[in-house]
Amino acid sequence: FNFRDCEFEKCRFVNCSIKNLKLNFFKLIDCEFKDCLLQGVNAADIMFPCTFSLVNCDLRFVDFISLRLQKSIFLSCRFRDCLFEETDLRKSDFTGSEFNNTEFRHSDLSHCDFSMTEGLDINPEINRILSIKIPQEAGLKILKRMGVVVGG
């Protein structure tokens, strides 16, 4: 399906299943998604301003490419086979989320909160990671990628 020239403002989507959707010239303003499934969604042509929150959602095969998503909320979400590429996520909150085969490429993750996440793997050579909060496991992966061995 293709949504074109649509605008949703102050909408709340609960227990929705949104699959195989392309968003062209699409606006989300102060929208909340709770307990939703988003699968096969291409958000590359979303319009701005764009403000939304996702709480306890499943995201599968969702591409966030060349987007400005500062201060977005992704609480307790499950990301599977997702891509964040050239996306500005500064000050976004991913607390309690799980990442499985999900990549961040050339994205700004400055001041993001990844507390209590699982499966997070961020390459510091291709992402901006200034002042981020990450779990110890993710920190060790970053150090290992940089050639730093932590041991006693």
PLM-predicted stretches and their roles:
Residues 1-152:
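Tandem repeat scaffolds
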